[in-house]
Amino acid sequence: MEFIIKSLLDTDLYKFTMMQAVLHQYPGAQVEYRFKCRTPGVDLARFINEISHEIDGLCGLCFSKEELDYLRGLRFMKPDFVDFLGLFHLDRKYLQLRASSQVPGEIELDIRGPWLHTILFEVPLLAIINEVWFRNTSVLNLDVGRDRLDAKVRLLKDESGYEECSIADYGTRRRYSRQWHAELLPLLAQGLGSNFVGTSNVYFAKQYGYTPLGTMAHEYLQAFQALGPRLRDSQVAGLEAWAREYRGDLGIALSDVVGLDAFLGDFDLYFCKLFDGMRHDSGDPFKWGERIIMHLESHRIDPRTKVLVFSDGLDMNKVMRLYQHFRGRCRLAFGVGTSLTNDLGPTPLQIVIKMVRCNGQPVAKLSDSPGKSMCDDPGYLHYLRQVFGVSADV
């Protein structure tokens, strides 16, 4: 049986854009990531040998000349970074996988090492765990997936007024299988037509000629909590470092690392003018959008010149409701994940890999959705909330 991950490009674009910034600005940073399955009663431990075998396959991959040439053709990729990738591979020594000694059936997966050399682990590891689980616990029925996908496409296309609704695939980490992902994308592109604007998956963007999409993830801004600036200034430092790296390119800022209130407090006139827009990934998307628009208007910036990207737990119905609510008031884009890549019948797994430490210090995300925060140091979490004025229910 061939390995699940066949290319190091089979990941999200923002892993490469963050990795490039790390190479240029923080090549010595040391980090720790931790896996968590939020779905109760999932016995992953019985498949630990299979998962381990797939990880061995992942760590045997390197970038081909064709893949490096593709990356070199992306306007925001610097030659020295692509040259570095030509020498790169994922090293198993940075990863520890074992059955949990605390909870029967659970696995413990920790990644520790240089940020530069571990940042590419997350997405393929999650894709591996998903696919190993589903191929052992369910029967693949692509007809169900095709029928459900067709229904979603028709839901949008049969209604008028959605001609400029931009939808992208953000579903690599939660996909049912690589096979389904590979089949789904051409079907989605054909069905949606001009509504389909690309995918976060670099491998499939290259294979099918789609636009690869993505800027930054939570880990990027989280790391700045331990990279030198005063904690209260960490988010500003992260955004300024991004601006130094990309000089106005890749200008979508993530708004929920320490909550929306703190983000808006940091996102001053300079950032409002510099960045192209913001991405929503937790909390009520309607309230979030209204507050973003109000914030832009308070700085005398026309919201219609900025893009609001929604990417939190979307399905086609939610996309359409959000589009109707905000259309004409700002530019809009929607990144749909699990609803596209893992809707074949079985219940999708809620699994994540999050950065929990950087340079030996705890880091955390205080999202706008209760229960989505993840940190291994309760004292630090309390301090972080205190510094950014975030209540204890997130």
Curated annotation (Swiss-Prot):
Keyword Phosphoprotein attributed: yes
Record PTM Phosphohistidine, positions in chain: H218
EC numbers: 6.3.4.21
GO CC entries: cytosol
Keywords tagged on the record: Ligase, Phosphoprotein, Pyridine nucleotide biosynthesis
A Pfam family reported for this protein in Swiss-Prot or TrEMBL: NAPRTase
CDD domains found in the cross-reference section: PncB_like (cd01401)
Superkingdom of origin organism: Bacteria
Any Gene Ontology biological process: NAD biosynthetic process via the salvage pathway
Catalyzed chemical reaction(s): nicotinate + 5-phospho-alpha-D-ribose 1-diphosphate + ATP + H2O = nicotinate beta-D-ribonucleotide + ADP + phosphate + diphosphate
Top enzyme category: ligase
GO molecular function: nicotinate phosphoribosyltransferase activity
Post-translational modification: Transiently phosphorylated on a His residue during the reaction cycle. Phosphorylation strongly increases the affinity for substrates and increases the rate of nicotinate D-ribonucleotide production. Dephosphorylation regenerates the low-affinity form of the enzyme, leading to product release.
Biological pathway: Cofactor biosynthesis; NAD(+) biosynthesis; nicotinate D-ribonucleotide from nicotinate: step 1/1
Family: Belongs to the NAPRTase family.
NCBIfam families for this protein: NAPRTase, PRK05321.1
Protein's name in the database: Nicotinate phosphoribosyltransferase
